[in-house]
């Protein structure tokens, strides 16, 4: 075996067999010692590394991978001890050129770039050859300069895998500098589908240690183009949870080395879509390096760029600027940068089918970038699985991010969503958890038992149903199925509980919380709820229709009865949701008509009723027309006007309900009605008791959960905007059932990357020179070191075209509205309907009034037709007379 394979390099330098990148080779040098940083080290943490080799002097050198038989290269696990168990044991050599020995420090201080890298004699280099210095690294403000960076790369198990040194500037700030997982970032170019990752011999670092690490918790953070603030917010929460578990020294599972059992996976949906500031933040943590990724390997397109690194860099947010904090708790990071934008469900395929199959974790935690888990929330989620062996999935409480001192509550939309989230977590989730089936575990913060997710031997099961949605988007799927898979997390929950011959349940963990930013803009809220409402509606129908699948499970008879009761409850709720818009109008009509009674508001009530009825109809028709033809972003003022109108309608209805009830009670009291007789008054019972019971249950339940503050800060806003949910959000959702998109645009084309072609397992490629590492690292730090200022850029041609189309759509919608409303007004006036009969009553019955108006209208129409026809006839006759005299 070649003694050069497992020799450790100076920090910040590539692990190479000692070949200088200049034209002249090295002088013969001896080895030297690397100062070891503080911390625990065990032979089990020794990590096999795969590194590029400089191309000069490659003659006569056999690649490290070629020292083994093909069986070793393809199946190293079968020869584990011989292949991996070679712990790091540096020796001090007698080097006449080496610097004076220095005491150990927290990190390796690589100030002298002239020291030799290895402690063996290179058989290919003569001792008389001179030694040449490397070029000096460029200054921080200069572009990355490429020295002689063409290097020989060796395929690992037939795949391109590179272990790249992290920048010395970063390494010098970190302890444990002697260990490969801290000194090197591992890059793998995946050229396959996620489902083929394991079969294509790809692996992950946790399986390459001399003692492979067991992954108890596998956390995925999915992101699209979130900025560095949102990403840092999530990572801060995740890191705090890992620190919390490392402090649980009395735990049988966790303790000071708990971080070795946790892997944090970040999956970014598209290389062209990732936010540059977020990418720079990942580089600052040591997880990402520019210039490493490849476009193709041997003609095969790279589908995902996988970076692995154990970071010791934490972060904090001050004044909207992310600041890095070195020497923090180690965290095993896995960053998957997908080449193309393929939606969130594809990101989960990489997580479950590719990485999950390699690591075989116990619990998988799903978090959206921007969601900040509480300091011990992930632990509490894990604890739910530990206490209940049959728990297949769990979720925590999703909280709306309210800002410092609750400043975001000033926005009524945020306050409304805060109240909505709170009541869902106080009433809905606990009820479903009591039955054992939660209709949806929110993808923003939830966890699953990996074993429960697996398909059966025929390839059928929860994951198969979950990932079926990826093939349906843009395919030949029916509209029902396509909309159903907008809420594929609901399908996953249903499939878990109904899994054949199993009895898995789902639980709600209130002590686990996750803060997420909610839409603060009406346009964003409409688009979000379109996806939620359509997905949940069609997924609920799917669950109800396929309820019989519960009987294929292994649940007890009592549990199945409980599921039946829960589904009856959900069916009733869905029926009410379907008829919500009609029920709201009927309540409006009954209350406004009642106010027109002579004992109440009389004529004033009648006039107000007619005005509001006409405004109601016009607003609702406007919403339908806009929903079917306009983008919310193209008509923001009209949508905001509708929200204001529905809030006014709600205030009027509340006034009507209270006023009618009070007058009715006063009348009964004057007749000597006792207090007990009040509950026999049908009007009082219908209006007052139902309203008080609803709001009373909200208050009592909130107090029982020790979480009542939303009743004070957000209840009024929620009540005022509740008609908007029925008459705007529902209307827009149902009018856009044809839209099965997630609201993302098509792919931007990313920059072209270099390719690698190999022969006999070896090839050449361009890689960043070590002299550029610090300069590149400094540049990445500068990207997010200042508060983000949105650049003022001229709109693109596509944006201008979209704006023009919004204008055209707006004009079109206004023309249609005027046309519809004027025709409706004509019919209402002629037939004396839509409340006009109450404003201008005439003698005689209603039928006689209608007949009289219709007769007059028909006379006007018929005489008008006759006059117009006569006018045309006169014109035709005049034409004939003129033609007779002109002869043409």
Curated annotation (Swiss-Prot):
Q: Name one GO cellular component term.
A: chitosome
Q: Name one GO biological process term.
A: ascospore wall assembly
Name of this protein: Chitin synthase 3
- Catalytic EC class: transferase
Keywords, A to Z, come to: Cell membrane, Cell wall biogenesis/degradation, Glycosyltransferase, Membrane, Transferase, Transmembrane, Transmembrane helix
Query: Where are the bilayer-spanning segments?
Result: 532-551, 572-594, 607-629, 642-664, 684-706, 814-836, 860-882
Q: Which organism is it from?
A: Neurospora crassa (strain ATCC 24698 / 74-OR23-1A / CBS 708.71 / DSM 1257 / FGSC 987)
Show the GO MF annotations: chitin synthase activity
Q: Where in the cell is it found?
A: Cell membrane
What membrane topology is annotated for this entry? Multi-pass membrane protein
Q: Which reaction does it catalyse?
A: [(1->4)-N-acetyl-beta-D-glucosaminyl](n) + UDP-N-acetyl-alpha-D-glucosamine = [(1->4)-N-acetyl-beta-D-glucosaminyl](n+1) + UDP + H(+)
């Amino acid at each position: 075996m070649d003694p050069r394979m497992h020799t450790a390099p100076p920090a910040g330098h590539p692990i190479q067999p000692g070949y200088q990148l200049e034209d002249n080779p090295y002088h013969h040098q001896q080895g030297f010692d690397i100062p070891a940083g503080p911390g625990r080290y065990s032979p089990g943490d020794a990590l096999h590394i795969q590194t590029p080799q400089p191309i000069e002097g490659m003659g006569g050198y056999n690649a490290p991978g070629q020292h083994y038989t093909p069986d070793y290269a393809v199946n190293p696990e079968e020869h584990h001890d011989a292949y991996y168990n070679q712990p790091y044991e540096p020796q001090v050599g007698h080097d006449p050129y080496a610097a004076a020995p220095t005491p150990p420090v927290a990190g390796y201080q690589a100030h002298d770039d002239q020291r030799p890298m290895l402690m063996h004699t290179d058989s290919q280099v003569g001792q008389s050859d001179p030694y040449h210095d490397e070029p000096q690294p460029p200054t921080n403000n200069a572009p990355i300069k490429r020295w002689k960076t063409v290097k020989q790369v060796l395929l690992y198990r037939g795949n391109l895998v590179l272990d790249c040194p992290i920048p010395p500037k970063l390494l010098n700030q970190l302890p444990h500098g002697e260990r490969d997982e801290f000194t090197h970032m591992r890059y793998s170019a995946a050229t396959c589908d996620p489902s083929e990752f394991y079969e294509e011999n790809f692996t992950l670092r946790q399986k390459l240690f001399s003692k492979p690490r067991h992954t108890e918790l596998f956390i995925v953070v999915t992101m699209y183009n979130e900025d560095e603030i949102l990403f840092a917010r999530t990572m801060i929460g995740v890191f705090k949870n890992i620190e919390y578990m490392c402090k649980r020294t009395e735990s049988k599972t966790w303790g000071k080395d708990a971080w070795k059992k946790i892997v944090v996976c970040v999956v970014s949906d598209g290389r062209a879509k990732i936010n540059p500031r977020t990418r720079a933040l990942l580089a600052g943590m040591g997880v990402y390096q520019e210039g490493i990724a490849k476009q193709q390997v041997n003609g095969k397109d790279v589908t995902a760029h996988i970076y692995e690194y154990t970071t010791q860099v934490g972060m904090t947010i001050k004044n909207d600027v992310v600041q890095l904090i070195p020497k923090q708790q180690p965290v095993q990071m896995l960053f998957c940068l997908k080449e193309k934008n393929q939606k969130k469900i594809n990101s989960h395929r990489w997580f479950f089918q590719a990485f999950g199959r390699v690591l075989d974790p116990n619990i998988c935690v799903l978090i959206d970038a921007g969601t900040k888990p509480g300091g011990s929330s992930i632990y509490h989620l894990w604890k739910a699985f530990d206490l209940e062996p049959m728990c297949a999935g769990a979720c925590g409480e999703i909280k709306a991010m309210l800002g410092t001192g609750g400043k975001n509550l000033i926005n009524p939309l945020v306050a409304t969503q805060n109240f909505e989230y709170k009541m869902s977590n106080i009433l809905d989730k606990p009820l479903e958890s009591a039955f054992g089936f939660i209709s949806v575990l929110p993808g923003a913060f939830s966890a699953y038992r990996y074993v429960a997710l697996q398909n059966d031997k025929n390839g059928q099961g929860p994951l198969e149903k979950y990932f079926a949605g990826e093939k349906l988007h843009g395919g030949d799927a029916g509209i029902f199925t396509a909309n159903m898979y907008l809420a594929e997390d609901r399908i996953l929950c249903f499939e878990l509980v109904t899994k054949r011959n199993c009895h898995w349940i789902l639980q709600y963990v209130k002590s686990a919380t996750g803060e997420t930013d909610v839409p603060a803009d009406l346009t964003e809220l409409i688009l979000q709820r379109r996806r939620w409402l359509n997905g949940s509606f069609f997924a609920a129908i799917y669950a109800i229709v396929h309820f019989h699948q519960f009987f294929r499970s292994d649940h007890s008879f009592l549990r199945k009865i409980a599921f039946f009761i829960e589904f009856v409850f959900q069916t009733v709720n869905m029926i009410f949701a379907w008829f919500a818009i009609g029920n709201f109008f009927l309540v409006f009509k009954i209350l406004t008509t009642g106010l027109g009674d002579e004992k109440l508001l009389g004529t004033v009530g009648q006039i107000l009723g007619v005005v509001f009825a006409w405004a109601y109809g016009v607003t609702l028709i406007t919403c339908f027309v806009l929903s079917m033809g306009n983008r919310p972003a193209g008509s923001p003022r009209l949508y905001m006007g509708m929200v204001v109108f529905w809030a006014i309608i709600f205030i009027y209805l509340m006034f009507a309900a209270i006023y009618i009830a009070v007058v009715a009670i006063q009348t009964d009291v004057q007749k000597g009605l006792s207090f007990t007789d009040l509950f026999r008054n049908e009007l009082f019972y219908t209006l007052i008791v139902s309203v008080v019971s609803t709001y009373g249950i909200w208050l009592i339940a909130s107090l029982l959960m020790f979480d009542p503050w939303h009743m004070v800060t957000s209840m009024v806003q929620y009540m005022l905007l509740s008609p908007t949910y029925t008459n705007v959000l529902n209307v827009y959702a149902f009018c856009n059932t044809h839209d099965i998109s997630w609201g993302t645009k098509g792919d931007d084309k990313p920059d072209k990357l270099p390719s690698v072609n190999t022969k006999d397992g070896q090839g050449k490629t361009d890689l960043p020179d070590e002299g550029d590492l610090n300069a590149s690292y400094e540049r990445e730090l500068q990207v997010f070191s200042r508060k983000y200022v949105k650049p003022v850029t001229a709109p693109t041609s596509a944006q201008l075209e979209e704006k023009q189309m919004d204008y055209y759509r707006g004009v079109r919608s206004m023309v249609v509205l005027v046309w519809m409303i004027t025709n409706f007004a004509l019919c209402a006036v002629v037939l004396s309907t839509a409340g006009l009969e109450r404003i201008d009553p005439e003698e005689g019955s209603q039928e006689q009034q209608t007949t009289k108006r219709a007769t007059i209208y028909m006379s006007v129409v018929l005489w008008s037709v006759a006059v117009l026809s006569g006018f045309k006839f006169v014109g035709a006759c005049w034409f004939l007379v003129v033609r007779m005299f002109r002869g043409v």
